[in-house]
């Protein structure tokens, strides 16, 4: 099975999907209750699997197996399509990297307290996190690959250990808690959406599978089922162990990843369990940060080269790291906010774009062998949901929806 390309592609999709977004889930769903959290997760999973399968449909018309999404956008919408696809992906990666830097700084700032020392300044921690880990990205793929291999194994071990410690402490009463405000379910949607954003690797998977529609479909279904299962168990553990009222109270005082660690420690009475959650959170966040920043770094390199702009390592380093670092320094507790706006961009790239491409593909190629079920009705419904998700961060900002933690 390990040599099976379909299974290998499924693991690539799962690895891309599972990242720091799952760390935000307990923070954003603290006031929602486990039942509605489960419904939101399953609903968004189904929606993004659907949009992923739309890419499979569209890739039947690709001129080359490794054509990128931007190339397909140019094929059907001209140069403006390529520009929109490229910019939306780049800004999405910037928003994610800003979220990861703020989250990493939050965890690092609280680390000295584990050794009985005073907490580090949040802004200092943010700078240290960015400089130390960013150096691996500047070195290139080899630097990231070597570090990620070690950290990924550590992340799996830490996650298994967290579940081993938390699941036996799950209380049924905690799982039965109802939302403090049902509108929280809507407010959390963009943040949860980023946890299923595997669409950035569609070209690589299509090329690896030789353009096989059947293998591509199965890779998406298997590859997304793995993170869905992991997310459900993670939410079962956090919602089942952490009392809703106490969890919300602690997060109101510290709505960051460090607050999640503190909540785990205070509610369970176990300092050790709190630090295990910190270790897992740190590893998950670091691996996500490295992957996203490598994407930003290499994407900018290609963009600068295409338009004959200076693309030496120094210029690329400044262009890649300065925007998210500035956001993190001016808004050091903005982990959830950055993820929320990343969700807006994710909704465009992972929903609006594939729906638009599929619509044009069906008009120009009405006899393709594979077409996703649901017809145009499903396209319109998914499009409307995508537009609503894109509006949610603004509705929160304008006061029409409640703010989730962070």
UniProtKB/Swiss-Prot annotation:
The keyword Glycoprotein does not apply. It catalyses: L-tyrosine(in) + H(+)(in) = L-tyrosine(out) + H(+)(out). GO terms for molecular function: aromatic amino acid transmembrane transporter activity; symporter activity; transmembrane transporter activity. Coiled coil: none annotated. One of its GO terms (cellular component) is plasma membrane. It is found in: Cell inner membrane. Its main location: membrane. Signal peptide: none annotated. Keywords: Amino-acid transport, Cell inner membrane, Cell membrane, Membrane, Symport, Transmembrane, Transmembrane helix, Transport. The keyword Oxidoreductase does not apply. GO terms for biological process: amino acid transmembrane transport. It is a multi-pass membrane protein. It comes from the Bacteria. The chain crosses the membrane at residues 7-27, 38-58, 83-103, 119-139, 150-170, 183-203, 219-239, 279-299, 314-334, 335-355, 376-396. Belongs to the amino acid/polyamine transporter 2 family. Mtr/TnaB/TyrP permease subfamily. NCBIfam families: araaP. Transports tyrosine across the cytoplasmic membrane. The transport system is energized by the proton motive force. This is Tyrosine-specific transport system 2. The gene is tyrP-B.
